[in-house]
């Protein structure tokens, strides 16, 4: 395997009973990488392979150039510096929350320069009030927060999360997601996050590995895979693209943020934020309409110059349009769904410049994408 620093390189190939796995990908060793696909496509199996719990001959894995396995070596699970969070918290019922958190933590971790400390984990995950309680008396969301804290205190080089919210109801998921976002904002620890819920992926992930039937369809930045018409995400009824945006201004009179994206500016209803802060936006294909000329007297606030990159038919009546923001067509990608009649009526074609009217912009709650640090400890330490 080629030694590439600051990247995760994986290639797992082999038969597991009747299931054939052929998964190869390279992603940055920073941020959150979502491993996404339908149930049974091999996502959890890939995590087990990364952890060394499943051994397939001839497979390879390396992170930051540190080879964990290849044709000549295989590091056992206990020798791999990973934290693993499962669907179920699996806490020790006879131990307190504090004892569960400290279980397995290296004794010399407090003296390591880049380690995350006990107090930092307590603060990040909001666990101070739970330390003396028994796991038996915790809610599902509290148990998962403790499990995440225990994984972090093992001082991992890589955090694996296998559908950590799948056993929780929607209300509890909404309670725990902000804590995961805080971890993303404050820690530089790479995470591989398995889910079949695209809403979780869109809210958390920076990069995406898209799987189907044991194979990797594509791997890359989240927005790039969302806007690729050759992949199933763009053709789905709820297709959308996520953007990283920078706050430029806030209008308290109307409660609107002005944010800059690659290729333009958007007005977003949102609470106040500081200039320079980063926010994640989501624009659904169904919330984008097209015009050949700048409209007048419209209620739509976000009207941006764009250029058609490509188009693909969706059945007999609709067309998926891939747009690039900005007059030069080199900005962020955006999706739109239009009827074939509208396409013909406007005489649209690839390469044409037009106006994209964005009727709705969703702001990820509490998400400040920040800047990624290089240390596994707290950002900016």
UniProtKB/Swiss-Prot annotation:
Signal sequence segment: none
E.C. code: 7.3.2.5
Binding site for ATP: 37-44
An example Gene Ontology molecular-function term: ATP binding
InterPro entries according to UniProt: AAA+_ATPase, ABC_transporter-like_ATP-bd, ABC_transporter-like_CS, Mo/tungstate-bd_C_term_dom, ModC_ABC_ATP-bd, Molybdenum_import_ModC, Mop_domain, P-loop_NTPase
A Pfam family the protein falls into: ABC_tran
Mop domain boundaries: 297-367
Transcription among keywords: no
Gene3D superfamilies associated with the record: 2.40.50.100, P-loop containing nucleotide triphosphate hydrolases
Catalytic activity: molybdate(out) + ATP + H2O = molybdate(in) + ADP + phosphate + H(+)
GO cellular component: plasma membrane
Top-rank taxon: Bacteria
Enzyme class, spelled out: translocase
Major subcellular location class: membrane
Keyword annotations from UniProtKB, A to Z: ATP-binding, Cell inner membrane, Cell membrane, Membrane, Molybdenum, Nucleotide-binding, Translocase, Transport
Record-stated family: Belongs to the ABC transporter superfamily. Molybdate importer (TC 3.A.1.8) family.
Oligomer and partners: The complex is composed of two ATP-binding proteins (ModC), two transmembrane proteins (ModB) and a solute-binding protein (ModA).
Purpose: Part of the ABC transporter complex ModABC involved in molybdenum import. Responsible for energy coupling to the transport system.
Protein name per the record: Molybdenum import ATP-binding protein ModC
UniProt organism field: Rhodopseudomonas palustris (strain BisB18)
Chain's gene name: modC
